[in-house]
Amino acid sequence: MNFKKLLGVALVSALALTACKDEKAQAPATTAKTENKAPLKVGVMTGPEAQMTEVAVKIAKEKYGLDVELVQFTEYTQPNAALHSKDLDANAFQTVPYLEQEVKDRGYKLAIIGNTLVWPIAAYSKKIKNISELKDGATVAIPNNASNTARALLLLQAHGLLKLKDPKNVFATENDIIENPKNIKIVQADTSLLTRMLDDVELAVINNTYAGQAGLSPDKDGIIVESKDSPYVNLVVSREDNKDDPRLQTFVKSFQTEEVFQEALKLFNGGVVKGW
C-alpha cells in the first residue's frame, strides 16, 4: 500500500473514532433532556390547598414550559412518606416544626426548597383596636395544646409582650417566659373555646381554623398577626438526593406569584400571609 493510501485509511479511521466519541459524549445529554421532560410530581393536601396550587401548575406550564402533576392526599402523614419512597419529587403542605418532627421521628432525609404561605395565628380583641392600647395586667387567652401554646407565645414575644428563654423555641411553654414587661396574665383554654372568650379577656390568640369559623380574618380583624418570618410558614420540600433538580426552583418561582396569593386570599377568606 502506498503512502497516499495509508494516509487515507488513517484519516477515515480518525474521523470514525471521533464520531464515535462525539456520539458517546452526546448520549448523556440526550438522556438528561428526556428525564427533565417528565412531569414534576408534587404532593399537596386535597381541598382548597390543591385548588390554590393548581394556579402555580398553570403558571409553571405557561411561563416556564414545566409540566407539574399534583398528587393529592387526605392525611398529613402521607405526603412525606410518598416523598421518602420516591413516589413524589416534592411536596407542599408542611411547616418547619412539622418537618423537623417528621425527620426526627421517621429518619427521612428531606430538604427545604422554598416557602409558600403562612396560615397565621393571630390575636383578636373586642376591647382594643391596637396592641399599644393593651394595659398592664391585661388577661390574654392562648390555646392549651402544646404546639399552639408555643406558637401563641412566639407571637406575643414578636410584639414585645414577653420574652422567652430561647426566642426560637417552637416547643416553648409558660415556664420559658423570662420577661413579662406588661405583667400580662396568661390563661390557657381549649382552642375551640377561644372565640367565645373574647367578651371576657382583653386579647385572645386564635388559630386560623377557629377564627375563620367565627367570621374573623387575621388580615381584617387581627390585632397582631404572624409574619412571613414565622417558623410556621408552609414549605416546598424535596428529598436530599434530588434537591438540586432545577425544576424544583422553577416550581417555587411559579408558586411565589401574586396570582397564587390572590387565589389563596379568595379561598381562605383573607386568612393567609405571603411566605416570601
Swiss-Prot record:
A lipid is attached at C20 (N-palmitoyl cysteine). A lipid is attached at C20 (S-diacylglycerol cysteine). It is a lipid-anchor. Coiled coil: none annotated. It holds the Pfam family Lipoprotein_9. One of its GO terms (cellular component) is cell outer membrane. It is found in: Cell outer membrane. PROSITE patterns: PROKAR_LIPOPROTEIN (PS51257). Its main location: membrane. Residues 1-19 form the signal peptide. The keyword Membrane applies. InterPro entries: Lipoprotein_NlpA. The keyword Transmembrane does not apply. Keywords: Cell outer membrane, Lipoprotein, Membrane, Palmitate, Signal. Belongs to the NlpA lipoprotein family. NCBIfam families: MetQ/NlpA family lipoprotein. This is Outer membrane lipoprotein 2.
